[in-house]
Regions:
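Substrate/ligand-engaging "lid" and interaction regions
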Residues: 2-192
């Protein structure tokens, strides 16, 4: 969110973020209760200078719990302007769970949810390759993009989603290995 905020401030990126909590128990209700606004307090060194800045992040348009708002979650795939998926579901988040079904609302695993979303997008736009998504997993595991892609292929096979969808995913969607550029500590309760 902070990176999107800065891109909006410094370029004509002009984008927003929909937060989707990856597990049933999450904090989207708290985020929604504060109008999807929060602050980032940057402390440390920037170009050799000590910094301590507080910035209100205002790029979240809404936050969803797919376990109670699955229809709204799936409708994200119908937005033609949607381009990016950025995830950080912890190291355990990128895992294939063979118990997940295409008909689950939603699948319990993150790769399962993402496959459901991608398949719905594929069907919504009739396989239009210009509607593929750019996917940046930020989970702290080696070759996170490769592992996420591997799990999606497993769901394509398990759920028998077909060669056309597999080809669309391979050709229209980019899944990249990433490395986070900073560690964000938890809420500084003792300082607030």
């Amino acid at each position: 969110d902070w990176i999107i905020y800065n891109m909006n401030q410094k370029t004509d990126f002009n984008s927003n973020v929909v937060v989707v909590q990856p597990i049933d128990k999450g904090m989207v209700n708290m985020l929604n209760a504060q109008d999807d606004l929060y602050h980032v307090n940057l402390q440390g060194l920037d170009k050799g200078e000590t910094i301590n800045s507080l910035t209100m992040i205002d790029v979240i348009s809404r936050a969803l719990n797919p376990y109670t708002q699955n229809d709204e979650f799936m409708k994200l795939a119908e937005q033609p302007e949607m381009r990016f998926v950025i995830s950080n579901t912890t190291e355990a988040g990128i895992a294939f769970d063979p118990a997940c079904k295409l008909t689950d609302t939603p699948a319990s695993s993150y790769p399962g949810k993402l496959t459901q979303l991608l398949y719905h997008r594929f069907k919504t736009f009739n396989g239009d390759k210009s509607k593929g998504l750019i996917i940046f997993p930020c989970e702290l595991i080696f070759l996170n993009g490769h592992k996420l892609k591997e799990a999606i292929y497993q769901y394509i096979e398990l759920w028998q989603l077909g060669d056309e969808f597999r080809a669309w995913f391979e050709e229209a969607c980019g899944v990249y290995a990433t490395l986070v550029d900073r560690i964000v500590p938890g809420f500084p309760r003792k300082d607030i």
